[in-house]
Structure formats: structure tokens, C-alpha cells
Amino acid sequence: METRPPAAPAKLSYGIRRGGWTRIGAATVAAGKKAAGDLDPRHHHHRVTHGGDGGGVGGGGSGGQEEADEQQQQQHDHHRLLQLHHHQGVQQDQEPPPVPVFHLQPASVRQLSGSSAEYALLSPMGDAGGHSHHHQHGFQPQLLSFGGVGHHHHLHQFTAQPQPPAASHTRGRGGGGEIVPATTTPRSRGGGGGGGGEIVAVQGGHIVRSTGRKDRHSKVCTARGPRDRRVRLSAHTAIQFYDVQDRLGYDRPSKAVDWLIKNAKDAIDKLDVLPAWQPTAGGAGAGNAAAPPSSSTHPDSAENSDDQAQAITVAHTAFDFAGGGSGGTSFLPPSLDSDAIADTIKSFFPMGGTAGGEASSSTTAAQSSAMGFQSYTPDLLSRTGSQSQELRLSLQSLPDPMFHHQQHRHGGGGGGGNGTTQQALFSGAANYSFGGGAMWATEQQAQNQRMLPWNVPDPGGGGGAAYLFNVSQQAAHMQAAAAALGGHQSQFFFQRGPLQSSNQPSERGWPETVEADNQMSHHQGGLSPSVSAAIGFAAPGIGFSGFRLPARIQGDEEHNGGGGGNGDKPPPPSSVSSASHH
């Protein structure tokens, strides 16, 4: 039992093992030794008797079995270390084929196996060096899991003898480019991260830097308002642009654009210079009140949003009524300036001092300015609270065909009774806001109340087409109009009601108001301007006060105070008020 072969041929019993996961028997060990030849005795302490020795010696068979059992026990003890150090069983002179171990690519295993001779030289003290080798990998197993083999070689570089480290270092470097992409990639990201970040910055995207990404979403102020810095090109234009950029050799699109602008400077200088801020330049709209507004302001606002464009188109369609009388000249009063518009825009909630008969000329000017400003910036107007702004431009739909037909049927004269009544129905919005209609202009100019924009064609050619319900006169106007239009007017309001999505209580208030006005219209068929004005200020109507919708005119108690003829309120106020508050 004491007979053992020399140390040279019996070093590694598991040297031929694939992957270090299966246990081998005595016959497998013998076959492996025959195939592998002499093994390095420094790799292992276990000595296994050769199969031939077992046959020659009487107890060779049992001795071989004991050695096999001992070997299996040792393998079981070192099973975990074998998993971490899968090179241990590789021969010095013969390399096993690549085996995927620890989820490494075959190339990495091939590299590891290529350095097996090195590992044999790195463990001159037998198991001591081997165990230290194991522990080194045991402390850093995660490096193996994601390709940290380059670090694996560097560990040996410090533990090896003076000569092998040079070979280890060389092979480690060679393997670093092939099997250590994970370790070198983070370094290239970190060390080359500065370079990578610079490359991204050169390309103009600042993709690496979050601030750069946010910066790309910023806007710039232009002649037509804030615009996104990013520009979307059509496919054909983008191809041409990038071709120019590549031919110029620029790495940033902005550089190519700068080059194009510089070379086209002569042609650009020939173009007209745009004003600094087009939407707030209300004077331009005032100068082009009669016909040009659609051509001058509509395209500018239309580029901002499609919804705005549609609303503007409708608005200009209604505002083009200014063909008769002073409607065109006073479409936008001279008082429409940037300050008035700014004040109008800033007032997101209604102001109490601008209601009722106490409305001053400046208030009227601001209101008229808001009304005119609405013609080309409905979005801004719809979000303001001054006068008619919170009444929403959702009412600016296309003119109702039925009502348009009724207008021509009832108001064909333009200045007759029905025409005047319909002008009253539209509360003389264009009359005193835009100066249309000779008789109503003077009386209603001082009573410019919160007007509900409503785009309906000009009933008589002089002007009250663009807006419905000067709240100060809405009830009286509707009363007279209801008599002229009959029950159809009630249907008209029912059809128009849903358009006022943000003011639902008023939808119910309008028809009932019209019905109540129908009764009163029999007694007040012909309303003089003064009477209608008085009734208008005290009328119940569908006063719009901010975002709550009382059925009073602007909230008579809130805004009208004691002026404007509160004592002249007709009976309908209570009924309409209760109806609109449900």
C-alpha cells in the first residue's frame, strides 16, 4: 500500500476535467494520465497509483481504489476553490480546449488556458502558492464574472517571481484587449470619459450631460414669440443639410447653419426686418383693421398652434364685417397699445372696478383693446379675465347657418327695426367696441361691459356681428331680438350653448333668458338706446363673473355697485339667476 509512483507522473488527477464540475473515478484518472503524459508535480500533493502499477503489485488494485477515494475527497473539499480557480488542472505543456467557465466567452477561456504555463511557474511552492492564488480570486470573484481577467493577471504580477511577471504582464495586456472589455470599457468610460464627453459635446448634443439635454429643450425668443431651439426638417431638406455639413467638415449642425447664414447674408439683408414682438404689436392690427388683419396677423398667430389658427380664421371671418360705416375705422381703437394689452393679459380674474355704469373710458379702452387683440391672439385673450376673456373663445365657432339665414331674413335693411334689434342682440359689441352702428356707438361706448365673443356675420352691414352679449345690455338686446327672431332664437342659443363648455350654467341661462325676454319683448318691442342701456346694466342675463357664473350682470352686487340703474331690473332676473345657478 505504500508503493506510489514517482511524483512527476501523478500530480493532477483532474487535469483533463472539463470545467471543474464533475468528479472522476480511478479509471478516468488513469486514462487522463495516459493521454496527458507527465504532469507537473508542483500542482498537487495527491499521488495516485498508475493503473499498470496496480496490476503489477498485488495490492495495486486496492491501493488505486484508496487513492481514487482520497482524490475524490480532496476534490470535494476543494470544490469551491476549483470553481474560482479553473486553471489549476491545466497542464504546462498541453492546453485543453477552451471551455466556457464562469460565463466567460470562449475567447476569454482560451486566453486563460494560454497562460496556464505561467500559472504553473507562479506556484513554485506547491499548494501554498496555489492556495494563495485561490484566495486572491476568492476575494475578488466578481472580477471574473464580468471579465476582470486583466486584473487577475495583475494579481499574479505582484505574487510571481521576477521573470514570470513580465510574461504575465505581457499576456495580461494582450488579454486586456481581447477578454477584458468590461474592465477596460469602464476605464475608457472613466478615463476616456472626458474624451467621450467632449466628443458628445462637439457633436452639439451634450448627450452625456443632463444639463445639455435640458438645454436642447430650451426656447429662444423670436419676432413671433418663444420658439423651440430644435428644428425639424423634412427628409429631403435634412439630407441636403447633412450633406452640406459633411462637406464642410463641421461636427455640429449649428456650425453648418452659421455658415449658410453667413454666406446668405446678402440675400438675408434684402428681406424685411420683422418687429421685435409681433403678438403684442397691437398698433399693426389697428392700422390694418379693415382688411389687412387677416394677412398681417393671422399667419403670425397661426404658426403658434393649429387651434389658434382655426380660431383666428373664424375671428377674422367675423371681423371682416367692418365694411360699413365706422366699424372699420374703429375696429381697433387708438387706445390699443402694448400697455393696455399687457394689463388685459395679466388680469386672469375679473376686476370689480371695470363693471357696471362706473366703467371709465380707460376701462372701455382696455376692454376694446382686449376685444380687438382677440382678433389675432385668441389664445391669450381666452386666458385673460378682463371683461370677455374668461368667456372662452370656444364660442368662436363658425357662424350658425340657421342664424345667418335669420339675419338676412329679419335684418336685411341693415338699419331697420329688425337689423337694429339684432345689433342689440349682439350687444353692439362692434358698435361701441369697434365703432359700428351710428346710433348705438355713443350710448354704448361708456357702457362697455364684459362681452361674450360670438362670431356671427354682420346682420346689417354696420357692425354688430363679432360679439354677442355686452353683459350690460344682453338681456334687453335678447328681449328685442327674441321678438324679432321668435322661437328660432331660443333654438339658436340651445345650439350655441354646448360651445360654452367652461360656462355650463350660462348655457341653461341663455335660453331661459330668451324665453323670459320673449314675454317682455311684447311690451318693449322698440327699445331706445337709453332704455336698453338701463335695462342692460340691471338685466339678469348671463353675467360672467370670473369662473363662477352668476346669472347677474357681472354680479350686479359685486361690480355694478349702486350705479348703472340697479333699480331698473326687470322681473326676469330672479328666474334666470336661479336657472343659471343650478
From Swiss-Prot:
Entry's transmembrane regions: none
Domain TCP per the UniProt entry, residue ranges: 213-271
Cellular location(s): Nucleus
Molecular function terms, GO-annotated: DNA-binding transcription factor activity; sequence-specific DNA binding
Keyword terms of this UniProt record: Activator, Developmental protein, DNA-binding, Nucleus, Transcription, Transcription regulation
A cellular-component GO term for this protein: nucleus
Taxonomy, superkingdom: Eukaryota
Region (Disordered): 30-78, 123-195, 283-306, 402-423, 548-582
Compositional bias (Gly residues): 51-64
InterPro entries: TF_TCP_subgr, Transcription_factor_TCP
Known role: Transcription activator. Binds the promoter core sequence 5'-GGNCC-3'.
Oligomer status and interactors: Forms homodimers and heterodimers with PCF2.
Protein name: Transcription factor PCF5
Species name: Oryza sativa subsp. indica
Gene, per the UniProt record: PCF5
